[in-house]
Amino acid sequence: MPRQYSLKMTRNIGIMAHIDAGKTTTTERILFHTGKIHKTGETHDGASQMDWMAQEQERGITITSAATTSVWRDHRVNIIDTPGHVDFTVEVSRSLRVLDGAVTVIDAQAGVEPQTETVWRQATEYKVPRIVYVNKMDKIGADFNNAIKTLHRRLGVKANAIQLPIGTELDFSGIIDLVTMTAVEYSGDALETTKEIPIPAHLEEQAIDMRNELIEAVAEFDDELMVTYLEGEEVSVELLKRAIRKGVLAVEFFPVVAGSSFKNKGVRKVLDAVIDYLPSPLDIPPVLGHTSEGVEVYRHADDEEPFTALAFKVMTDPFVGKLTFFRVYSGKIKSGSYVQNTTKGERERFGRILQMHANTRQEIDEVYAGDIAAAVGLKVTTTGNTLATQNDDIILESMNFPEPVIEVAVEPKTKNDQDKMGQALAKLAEEDPTFKTYTNTETGQTIIAGMGELHLDILVDRMKREFKVEANVTEPQVSYRETLTVPNEIEAKFIRQSGGRGQYGHVVIDFEPNPGKGFEFVDKIVGGVIPREYIPSVQKGLEEALGGGILAGFPVVDIKATLKFGSYHDVDSSEMAYKIAASMALKDAKNKANAVILEPIMDVEVVTPNDYVGNVIGDITSRRGRLESQEGRGNAISIRAFVPLSEMFGYATSLRSNTQGRATFVMQFDHFDKVPKSIQEEIIKKRGSN
């Protein structure tokens, strides 16, 4: 089947925001207006088209990234609706990796919120052009100008309105387009019924001023516009649109639009902005990959180049089995074709190719550069793997995912559950790179680890619903880490004589802190003092010892180990001896390099009425929290603080009690930090390890 939409007429976009800003409702309305669905569902009623998992419909939140495709102004728009809850940021991250542009939805009353900052950071990391949609303009307390100020203040970005709302809160009735200087008025909630009206007289001067501010903001991106404006000539609609688009594509300018998705006001204007300003696959830089020899290779959005795609999501579908979502960067591929998983060096077969609409699907014969689709039949492919033409060895940059910060033990209720649980956990871990499972060697318990309590709740619930596994779950535990804080040289010898051939391994290793860079091993052996064949054993010995910890059994992270000297024995030296010597060196570093325990620190935001600020701050301080800021949020105060995760269990109940249920809070993992000495001693004592 030939390509239906040219690359120029294709948009791959994500919709992202803080929880409850209205992402899923916005996507629903987009699908409604583009004719993809004929009846809209409401998230809070559990009827949303995009929230298709049972847990999503019950909880009224989006957990996985549902993908769908629609058409607007003869353009094909592939949309991914992403979760706003902090426990599911991995879904946002892997979606942004394969998108060309995004719509960031913010609440007109709240402005930029903590999760907005998180997803914005992720989008910036992947250099994704964005437009900003200020939603809920009909909400009590809605303030369009203040919402834009929060973009400047909290994100530090260049953002200007390209629209001006007519009215606010219950009086929100229309929009002035600052690019074309035209106005529309909305009537009725069921459909976006509009009529063109003259710009209201009381807003005319403000609209002219805001258009001039917009022109000044984007003039640097277009020389012709700059000259036209400086010479006092009228800036045409085409010229202004071109300059805005250039700024957006450079990821240096972010146009802001307004509306109320729930009331069907402004959604068509959002779609227009997507077409006018967000990139097609032709507008983004070619994707960079490397061959197995490390040679850089670029792939362009071109059907005639070799097939190259990135798998960005794996999920189990109750009807077709394992589904692998992928983005095609170059070339084309037919269903039934064989491809190479270059990441794993294995051949795979595209059994069927599906175009997804939330959890319904349409089978297609062929996909082309710029397409997002799902494949059935891939056996070994996981998130972040590259798929390419057979005999090609290009590997695209993969994705980095945060380590879990919270864990619980799960115990199957029956022998039958025991047999099924391992298989269920393996499938769930394959779908979600931030979900880890392992067996505690001391207790024999199965441990599951994730990004938060809700994350683990959902996974345990899925285990019950989808895999029919009943399990008891223990209280959540914090996932601590260990590290070294002082550089030190450590010498270790492993010598064993017991008749016949003995064991001999001798190493001298410099250990030093390596903040934020994980484990790094450097080989500086010269003159053959340790034979080359034993050096990998030293590295392996260290890596195995890191997992078991040196203080309290938690994984050791962020250290650099430089092997610089040692010796060997012609007969007794072996791989095992050097592995043991290396692990002895790491254990010895516990005291000499000042080992410490690290704990996850959460970025917490509490929004509370003024009357309870003192109670909230007192409670945060008592939890070892460090206050960062306070700022007004309508009739309330927003308090930001960094608080150890271990102190946040049960916080929701405490906050309800301290504020008579009138405050809300969100938290997300921010960084690891050293545990105070007294608490470190308690943890070590509790773990029964020295």
Swiss-Prot record:
Residue intervals of the tr-type G domain: 8-282
Keywords for this protein: Cytoplasm, Elongation factor, GTP-binding, Nucleotide-binding, Protein biosynthesis
Pfam families listed in its UniProt record: EF-G_D2 (PF22042), EFG_C (PF00679), EFG_III (PF14492), EFG_IV (PF03764), GTP_EFTU (PF00009)
Top-rank lineage group of the source organism: Bacteria
InterPro entries in the cross-refs: EF-G-like_DII (IPR053905), EFG_II (IPR041095), EFG_III (IPR009022), EFG_III/V (IPR035647), EFG_IV (IPR047872), EFG_V (IPR035649), EFG_V-like (IPR000640), G_TR_CS (IPR031157)
KW GTP-binding (keyword) present: yes
This protein's record includes keyword rRNA processing: no
GO annotation, biological process: ribosome disassembly
Family classification: Belongs to the TRAFAC class translation factor GTPase superfamily. Classic translation factor GTPase family. EF-G/EF-2 subfamily.
Name of the featured protein: Elongation factor G
